[in-house]
Amino acid sequence: MKRKASAVWHGDLKSGRGQISTESTVLKDTQYSFGTRFENGPGTNPEELIGAAHAGCFSMALSAELGKAGFTADRISTSATVTLDNHPQTSWTVTKIHLETTAKIPGIDAEKFAAIAAGAKAGCPISRLLAAAEITLDAKLV
C-alpha cells in the first residue's frame, strides 16, 4: 500500500508560502508558511499534520487491539501534541509526541484497557515511524 502527498513552496523561508495536497484531495492546495509553523499563525503546518496522522493511526490501532481482546469501543477520541524543539546541534527536531485518548468501551476494566492501549501505542505504524521522538500516552476510560 502506498499513499501520496505533495508540497509546493514559493519564495524564501520567512516570507514565502506553500501549498500541501494529498492524493485523496482531503487537503488540496492547503496553505502553510513560516508564520503557520513557527509563529502560531492561522493555517496548517507539518507538525500539526503529523499529529493528526498519529492520532488517527493510534485510534485505529487501539480499536484493532481491543477487537483482538474481544472488546468493541463505542467511541475512541485521541489528540496528539507534537513538540518541535530547536537544538543547537540538530536544528529543529520533533522531540516529543503526547497522545491523549479517552474511550468508552463496554465491559473492560481500567487495568486491561491500559495494557491494550500501551500495546496499541507500540504497534501503531505511525508510532513506529516516529520512534526517534519520545512518545507518551495518557489513556482514560469514560
Model-derived features: where do they sit?
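Extended beta-strand/beta-hairpin segments
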Residues: 1-52, 59-142
